[in-house]
Design a protein with these regions (language model features):
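Short, hydrophobic alpha-helical segments
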Residues: 123-131
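Short boundary/hinge segments that flank catalytic cores
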Residues: 86-88, 108, 117
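Short, intrinsically disordered/low-complexity patches at protein termini
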Residues: 47, 111-112, 130-131
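C-terminal boundary of histidine-terminating zinc-finger modules
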Residues: 102-115
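Conserved catalytic-core segment of NTP-binding enzymes
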Residues: 1-98
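Charged catalytic carboxylate motif
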Residues: 34, 114, 118
Length: 131
């Protein structure tokens, strides 16, 4: 769903049975305001929050360093603040973008890629919440 807690989001959770929500956000302070409102909306409507994901949390430069251009740790901190599971950090990555543009998930085309392993780790955590 788009960010926020407006009519679209509220109608969606009221009209469709949802087993759980995964909140995905960039780590910027402004985006985290929407995350907090989203958590509150899901709690008020009785939708279980399966966890939070920090998207575009960093990119790895040619020098091997991680650059955190959108901030650092805000999504994980928010998960702790609201006692929700933090599912992981997803980096900016050219291979991920290319696979998405080609319509072929990276986890399928390159299952041993480090980003594929991050996605699979997150998927395992989500699966555990249903067991």
């Amino acid at each position: 769903m788009p960010p926020g807690t407006g009519d679209t989001q509220l109608t969606f959770v009221q009209e469709i049975k949802i087993d759980g929500a995964i909140i995905v956000s960039t780590p910027q302070d402004l985006a985290l305001l929407d995350v907090k409102r989203g958590i509150q909306m899901f709690e008020k409507t009785g939708v279980k929050i399966l966890g939070l994901i920090d998207n575009m949390s960093f990119f790895e430069g040619d020098d091997g360093k991680k650059y955190k251009i959108f901030g650092e740790g805000g999504v994980e901190k928010t998960a702790k603040e609201f006692d929700k599971e933090f599912l992981g950090f997803l980096p900016l990555n050219e291979d991920l973008r290319t696979s998405a543009d080609n319509g072929e998930p990276l986890t399928y085309s390159k299952p041993d890629h480090k980003i594929s392993k991050i996605f699979l780790g997150i998927a395992k955590k989500i699966r555990q919440s249903f067991l």
